[in-house]
Amino acid sequence: WECQIPGAEAGMMYKYKIYGADGSCIDHCDPYGFYSELRPNNASIIYDTTDYHFTDSEWMKKRSVQKDAPLNIYEIHFGSWRKKDDKDAEGWYTYREMADLLIPYLNENGYNYVELMPLSEHPCDESWGYQNTGFFAPTSRYGTPDDLRYFVNACHKHKIGVLMDFVPVHFAVDAYALWNYDGSALYEYPNQDVGYSEWGSCNFMHSRGEVRSFLQSAAAYWLSEYHFDGLRMDAVSNLIYWQGNEARGVNNLAVSFIQNMNQGLKDRFPTAILMAEDSSSYPGVTRSVHDGGLGFDYKWDMGWMNDTLNYFRTAPEYRSENYHKLTFSMMYYYSEAYVLPLSHDEVVHGKATIIQKMSGDYEEKFPQALVMYMYMYAHPGKKLNFMGNEIAQFREWDEKRQQDWDILKFPKHREFHRFMMELNEVYEKHSAFWEADYAQDGFRWIDCHQEEKCIYAFERKSKKERIVAVFHFGNTKEQEYVMKISGVKKLKLICSSDDSEMKKAHPEYQKDLPVKKGAVSIHLPAYS
């Protein structure tokens, strides 16, 4: 059914008064509303979505899902990247103001995509946007829907792609929103066993056609009306398995929902990126739906992330026992199209920040973090880093506070940031780091049997170049590490975590390292 209300105009607030089957009478926001009041208020607001005109037609025409191209993603929380010095207000920058601040930073630092934690309307700041009430409404915390369109348009103007996190698994339990909408379980499961998620939110009932249509429409809306370049689907393992628990079995109807949604999105938006945050080992996440897969373009490699961080937490004298943690990823790597994520989830809830996770004292943490990032960028797979990682922030992320930009006044952090900028530049410049990410001939182990010395060596290849990556994760110097390499007469140094020591040890090799009789001798400082 539908009705028309004479005199309704843009800017007016409204709610639906629902008389429930259980005898309740509750005022609800519009599930399909385009704009909302700022929390704690929750009325929907009539909004004219036809006023804004994008000027990014060239970008939209040329964009594509290029797995043979660099993809370097900077993940941010919109409200805490930077804050205004205004003690009487929230301190948020608007969508338009953030365009002027964030875009130059992304360009200067060498990131070509930004991923925004959920911007769909949500009542609780502490949920970070992952417990939604408005699946079609950008949060009013940072401005209007047209302000968000301005932000995306500005990013495209400066050749920055924009991804947004989308949450198709669950929704907030607030009574004014989707919960018990008509006095019964309308959007959610009626039974308690699967009705609520591990976060206390309501699980969507993906077996209902109306719920499927609602979520598929919402996903398409962000791509169509806001020109987002892709969506990162949150908590996919909680869709695949009942309550995210493999022991409870596959939720076949939710799996078919994912397939239908992804296929529909690909049919309408073939050049948009679909990315899965999935911690399970369910097969075929990035295989096409036609071939029986889930239809995502990329999947986060949570296994690589966990193994890598666990390795660098380990004291150097015990790393030989965990040597395999940095070789195991290549045992399964080609089963999916992976992104290597060091995301917001790794720097909260007492887990410690990336720099804090490194073994050793303050002085030892920095070189280890640098060489860990070099390993990340040399390893096959696209890259994702959360804000603050690039400046070696020691304080865990807090959505109420901006990043600790003041630490850049300290030489260690300033040099770390400079190196990360250089690393991003090296990554983008050299095709061997990204052209053959998902081709088995794009990677080859040279040496993965140096357990006692904590040395790893491998080769990355593209049509134009070969790059050899050598890592020493031990805390002692290796004066003459001999590495076998065939088919070349010399190696040119393109990047080192410690140029000064390398050049001091081999002043004659500042440009080239000679290969003699199929081998090269290299001085490896600690953590290099």
Model-identified regions with their sequence ranges:
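Carbohydrate-interacting/catalytic domains
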Residues: 1-70, 95-106, 363-366, 379-385, ...
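Substrate-binding/active-site clefts of carbohydrate-active enzymes
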Residues: 37, 60-68, 77-228, 232-250, ...
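Short, contiguous acidic/charged loop-to-helix segments that flank catalytic cores in large enzymes
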Residues: 135, 139-143, 206, 248-250, ...
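Feature representing long, continuous alpha-helical segments
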Residues: 209, 213, 217, 259, ...
